[in-house]
Amino acid sequence: NMGHKNKETDKKNLKLTDLSSVGEFGFIEHIKKNVKKYNESTIVGIGDDSAVIKNSNLYSLISTDMLVEGVHFDLSYFPLKHLGYKAVVSNISDICAMNGICKQITVSIAVSNRFKLETLNELYEGINLACKRYKVDLVGGDTTSSQKGLIISVTAMGVVDNKKICQRSGAKNNDLIIVSGKLGLAYLGLQVLEREKQVFLVNPNSKPDLEPYKELVERQLKPEARTDLINFLEKNSIVPTSMIDISDGLSSEIIHICNSSGMGCILYSDKIYKDQSLLKVCDEFNLDPISVIMSGGEDYEI
């Protein structure tokens, strides 16, 4: 549980630390204190010019994502702890999509001077929590200033057995298309949060009741990567012909696979699983469930 208690009263009594007073290297040292190592393959982590990672007959997998405030997230309803967690998870998900296991990440941030050291601590709490949950080592990154807002860039490094790698280009004739879980919930969670924000702007005294939308909001604020699926495939000696993670919605992802594989595909709308809460909230927001599933995105299913 990543409960976000109201700390406003505490904050008034605490003197917060300006980032300029610790400096970039002081900040790196501060972050380094809470970073633990989980993998033997990590030879050198944070604090050198480059991380050093040992590999054998495995392929290295490397993936990068960038999140920009005002484009990818809105801090008025997105707690920094959750943001840090989600930034890591979305990258681990890319490694899963190659049938690999994520081992290391680097995190780079650009911050404006409105962020204090204590607020960035919350971001790194979420990052460290995801590292612990998925047994991933944070091995480096960069920090710099930005004119306004927060930018986070995460690079994930993983490994895959060279005989078990799954690319987008492997789909074959008569392959069955399978999705690892529910789709569309994260998008609906975002709609709920956006609606509550608009209500709050009109009436700052209103208290949002998110309880009925708990699962949807959690899917948006704290998604998980399907490492369990990769373990399942390994345990059962299954190597799919092709895989992709659903970050942008089912339709664009399946088109990526089709284009890379030189294939077409048929999707049956009656065979696509529609969660009860999805149907209920689609009705409430006057949205078409299939459109939400096809174009919603950020589900991080495979």
What are these model-derived regions, one by one?
Residues 2-302:
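Helix-biased detector of long, well-ordered alpha-helical tracts
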